[in-house]
Amino acid sequence: MADGEHTLPADEELFEQPPPQQQQPEIAEPIVMAQEPIQGVSEDPQASEATHEAPDNYPVDHQMENQEFYHEPQIPEPQQIPQIPVFQPAAYNPPNYVAPQQRANNFGEPAAADARPLTEQEQLAAERPTEDTVWIDSDDDTDVEEAILRANFWLPYSDHNYDPPDPADRIILPTEGPFPCIAGLDEDCNIVKQWMPEDAVGPGSPGTQYRRNQQAGGGLPSTSVASQQQQLPVRHNIQNRPMVAAQPFSIGGNQVEYGGMDSRMQQRGVVRDGPQYRVMNDFGNGLPMRGLLPPRNSPAANAINRAREQQQQMYHQAGARGSLQQRAAPAPADPTPGSYQHIVNAVPGGGANPMRRVPPQARPGMIGGAANNNRARPTHVTRPMDTQEFEHPVAPAAAPPHRVVDVAPHRMTPEQRQELQQMNRQRAAPQFPAAAAQRSAEVIVIQQRPGASSRAPRPSMAQEDLLRSPTRRLSERVPQEHQTPVLEPRRFQVKVTDTYSTPIPKASDQLPAQLTEEDPPEESAAAAAPEDVPDAAPEDPPKVILKPTPPHRMTQEEKNAHFARLTTDKEKPTSSTSILPQDAAPPHVPPPPPPLVLRPHHQDETLAMVQSVFESKPRQPDTPKDKETISKIADLLRFSADEFTGQSGSSAAARQRTVSGSAARAQTYQMHHQQQQHHHQMPMDQRKRPSSGRYDALMGAMPLQQQPPPPPSQFQHTDSIAHRPRGRPKGTRHPSVAVQPQRSGGARTLPPRAQTVAMSARNGANAKNSDSESEGIDEAAEESWTMRCHCGMDHGDGDTIECEGCKTWQHMACMGLTLKSNTSKYKCEMCLPRRLPVSKAEAAREQERILNRLRAAARKQKRKSEPVEQKQKSSQPSTSRKSAPMALQQPAEPRVAQLNDYSKQASALLFGMEQTAGADTLLAESRLHKKARRMFVEEAVEALVTTDLVQIRQVILEVNGHVSMSSEVKRQPGGGNCIFMYDGLMKGTAGEDMGDGQELVCIDTKRKGNDTKFTRRSCVPNCVLKHVLGSNATLGIMIVATKDITRNTEVTLPFDADWRESEVELECAEHMKELQACPFESERRRFAAERHRAMDHKKQEAEEARRADEERRRLEEEVRRERAAKTKQMDEAEKARLEAEKAAEKEKKAKERKKMEASAAAAPESTNSITAREERRIQQAEEMFRRQEEEGKRKEARRRSKSVTPGVLEAAGTAAREDAPEASIPVPAPSPPASRRSVSRTTQPSTSSFATPTEPPAKNKRMRSVVPPKSEPASSAKRVRATTVATPKATTANDSRKRTASATGKTPVAKRSKNVAPTSFALALIEKELREQARNSTVLEMILPDYIMNEERSGLLAGQSPDFSEVRAQIEEENRMKERSRKREAKKKAVEKEKKEHRKEPKKTNEPGPAPKSEKAVEKAVEKVEKKPKSPQKPPAKPTAQNPPLKKTEEVDGIEREASESSSKESSVAPEEKKNPKKITFAEYNSRRSQKREAGECSTPPAVTRRGFIPSTEGEDLVNVELSAIPLDDHPSSSNTAPTTTIAPSVGGAPKPTSVVVKSPSTRSRTRGAASESADDAPAEHSMSLQDRVFSMFGSTVDAPAPPPPPASAETNSRRSRSTRWN
């Protein structure tokens, strides 16, 4: 053991502290020892011999043969000591146990009781052992063999597991020398019997010398007294006990008492006259006594039959000093029997210092009952003095090398593969022990100290020998310096094997490694010396047997030679001595018995059969020679397989199979029993072996060769050929063929029941089929099954399913199940009462249909097979593939049993892979030699347990079930639920493409499995899953052992590769009760915690995102609701505004209607009318004038668009906003600012002339004469222009635009006006667009651009804007003009009054009637009548044709200005009285003009000459206008010579019309400029109506001359010469 360890065994015995007593005088005085306790045995051989020749060493075989031992009793009262040596037991007193004290190191420093250090001579004497003393420790817990087993195999135990836990408790059986023999130990570890051998008692024996000394009566020498003493702790307080290294000693390890001893003190140890016990080592050498106790703690003892003076001291005193002789020659102490020592401290004289180990201590037996098992004793460990020591086995193995095979073969890098191949060529084959009882030995090799002068030569460890002393008599011994070490070969072999399992249960190394030839076991050299031993002698290379080259690494020649040697290799005897070196066996030891070898299964054959799937290549023959060679090898392999299969009862006749019961045709095949695996059937090769194991209850079946042949089946169908046996239909005698169903669902295969022997109808003999499929069916038929179905039939054809509760079978169709149904936990209707979807009658009819189909298929198969049988002639099997018939090369049915079901994806994957060489043979062997079966390992816990010894790399069982891909099955990660995941089919190596996991294969053993479904997982597995690919894409997944597995051992597999992803606890077979101790479970829990934390983090992030999304949606919903509420509010406001507008409009229409009715009633009806011809002529003239005006407008628009810049337009728009009237719309409704601004004249409505007195005056200079106060009367012409008002509806069509007569051109005054800003049509377009948006949208939000609003403008636009000082000056001028206009209005009223009086005069018949009045004119006339001027004026004289009425200067000036301003005025809307006038077309206008109208009397005052006017189409109000409000194209001027005649109403007759030449519009337009300026004398035509003017101009005919112009007066000429602000 290592330094510092103080282990106490479970059965340690402590002694209570005895009461302080006075030392008895009978005790001999102790001998003072001058050395520290336990310093080793003297090296001098004479001391050892002197010990053996001492007279006190009398053999104790006669005394101890029939002696019993008892516990020490409680100290009674003093008794009389008898005079004869009689052993008397005392009453048992149980001791008081106290806690042991940590013992100090018993080397390097003296004990606390030793005050004097040892001298140099004493130290040398203490370190003087005998040369031939070698102590072997074969049962130490720290031996290297156990470490190797743990490192290579990861075994939780070693072969020393059943020994006592402490080395002191182990008994070494004597094999040579005069040892005291023992008969054994009882159940309480007590020595049953002990004696000395007969040859040990002789003339020169220690016993003889003892008798001689006893007869002489001489006392014992001081040196021999110490050899008799045994180191024995007294009964005292352990806390005060001295630090000793010796173990308590008593005879046989029992506490004894002797007669005559003091009753107050128990006798401990050995006295001179008592029964002596010879202390010697394994080789018969005596050992000196060491480590005596101080006297103050030593017990007292009475010598028997001896005087006090003859007693010798047993223990030395701490303070006293002995004699020089005692100090110079200390007495060696003999160890107890069975003790062992280390070889320590190599000294110059050769040999070593043996350090005494603790002896075994047996428990004493009681007379009255069993021994007390609670008694314990302290165990003290003896430490060597030299710490520089190295322990290793005699045949040590090297340290566990770098295990390349820990990596799975398909995950190895190319460098690892190369290193593994190199290791496979260099290492030796494993060596197995010859006998289980032989164990490895351990020696201590000590480094030589620097001060040592020489060293004993160490034998070479390669020879695997031990330094041992021969068996000799004591008298024949020679001095040590003359002795020569004898080399004897060892008697044992060190078992060094390897495994494929992971040495340390790390999570990263427990993936299922693949068993291929790329990862063979590593063998360590059995005779290799430890590398850490300095000055090691060169060793001979060990004799090893290299492992044969794997098949996938063989060349073609090596393969041929290997298969050829298979037969001869099997005939050789296989024993452990054949593989061991010949020089390792000792000559005098008989050879050990050979180990148990499974004869049908050979290790070399396994190596030949198992081939790596990853390295295998197709063996396609290229030449006829290759084909012949391959055929021979195949035949040789088949015969070799038949050799050992024939031992089980096969014969040559059994290798012929008959097709359909006929012997005419035979086929050569391999005799391998293919049986149907089922989880209910028993193993086939059950053999009864004498054993008392717990799993041997079911091993009573007969061997295979002794079993009678089972009765053959009465019929055979395709399912039985395909290894899917079915039952026999009820009531049928003909062969039935069942259609093979798809096994993709939950249906299970129902094994056939044992049936009676049926006679064949063809030959009258027993129907026998010798092929492998039928044999497998017959073997499976041994099991009986029960069919209890809903339909009432008991046949087993079709898809059936087994109830998990009562283990009965039902038809799936009768239970309402399909192949796709989930039947993992199916129970019948009896175990789980429920209502079935199929009634009994329907189920019976369905089964009848199934049976009919089976019968029809059987008849069809029979008809197909009969002609083939007649053509067969040969019945002898062919020995060559070339000579075989063609039918054998292309068999109709596969010969390999398909014991598995495959999904579509799995089948596609397997068909694309290459076949493994020898796979069919290996699969047949695994099915034939099953080495495990299901058993109960615990209560209600079944597992797979081995039924035979399984060697490493042997196949135990084949896993059968439903093979599918991992993506097709729902499984539990890590393994479980009878589903095994296999990753051996994955492609690629480490560092390459490992695939996407689609090649992970899962085998579901619940559907079609065998006993492998009960295999459990473990963190220290002893098996793995491997695979081979046979013919017809048959995947064989097998359980292969990774170490030697003994019988009755549970088979465990590693966890699946995805065990970390499991959410439930792993079911570890090693830690079922303490799962937290499993490293895999701990790792899985850590991964699960990390995975849960990641999932919680993701959930938290998702929750935060969800909350943020909900908050965003909530805010959007709030904004949406606010917008909807605002929109609704605005819609309601707009609706209210529109309703208010409609109500106001309706009210206005009612008022207008009333006014029109009143005016119509007040106006006199006109009797005069014009003819249709005259009306047509007027219409043609007006049409011509309209066209001319339109052409002029287009030209003017083009000219303005070219000349007007954007800056001017914006300035004009700004000015228009400033000059726009505020009360343009009479309806009181809110409107945006853009609707209140004044824009282009194309869309800007005219302002109403009926403004309230509180309104500010209009800023537009062109409208200041048009907007008079409401209280003042206006003339006819002004009222016509002022009646246009703004309408709420914006007109977008061009036909709704109305222009005045002078809109197409400019007067000279307008042309000369520089301060008038041009019309801004850009603003009109913007307003038009805004109005369109307002009309189409529900929310009226019109926002003008920034450059239109009142924001800051750029410098260019600011420079182009008009000067506000000039605007204010213009406003003042307009106010002055308004005052002047009021005065003129007063004068005009007098003229109108005159005209009214003129209308009242009677008209003549030939005089044309007045022009018709419009409704508006009538209405205004009524107003003028009501409103009389303030100052009455004198009515003017009546105008006549010769004397036209003259106007004053102010009146003419105002009228001229008004005409100038209104020349470019555009009227696009109806009058104010009519909010929405009715629009008419030109056709309606012509139809209205064609109607007869009465000529009305001219009631308008004379006005200035203006251009011609084309009536608008926008209503009746503007059509029937007076002539005075229309500028004419031609008027009398200074260039016209024709006089103008005005027919006054007072003239009695109409004048004769004169011829008037009608000028063209161009001629009239040339003269209008002067006429428009010279308006001093108003012509008479302006006071006429339209008809009067037509008659005056044209007369009754077309040639009517125009009236002459009025004469010019001085006032007129002077007025024209006066400059005005428009000139």
From Swiss-Prot:
Broad enzyme group: transferase
Entries under InterPro entries matching the protein: SET_dom (IPR001214), SET_dom_sf (IPR046341), Zinc_finger_PHD-type_CS (IPR019786), Znf_FYVE_PHD (IPR011011), Znf_PHD (IPR001965), Znf_RING/FYVE/PHD (IPR013083)
Biased composition (Polar residues): 206-227, 645-669, 873-882, 1242-1252, 1533-1544
EC number annotated for this UniProt entry: 2.1.1.-
Pro residues biased stretches: 587-597
Keyword Lyase in annotation: no
Pfam families membership: PHD_5, SET
SUPFAM superfamilies referenced in this protein's UniProt entry, alphabetically: FYVE/PHD zinc finger, SET domain
One GO BP annotation of this record: methylation
Subcellular locations according to the entry: Nucleus
Start-end of PHD-type zinc fingers: 786-834
Family: Belongs to the class V-like SAM-binding methyltransferase superfamily.
Record protein name field: Histone-lysine N-methyltransferase set-9
Provenance organism: Caenorhabditis elegans
The organism's taxonomic lineage, starting at the top: Eukaryota, Metazoa, Ecdysozoa, Nematoda, Chromadorea
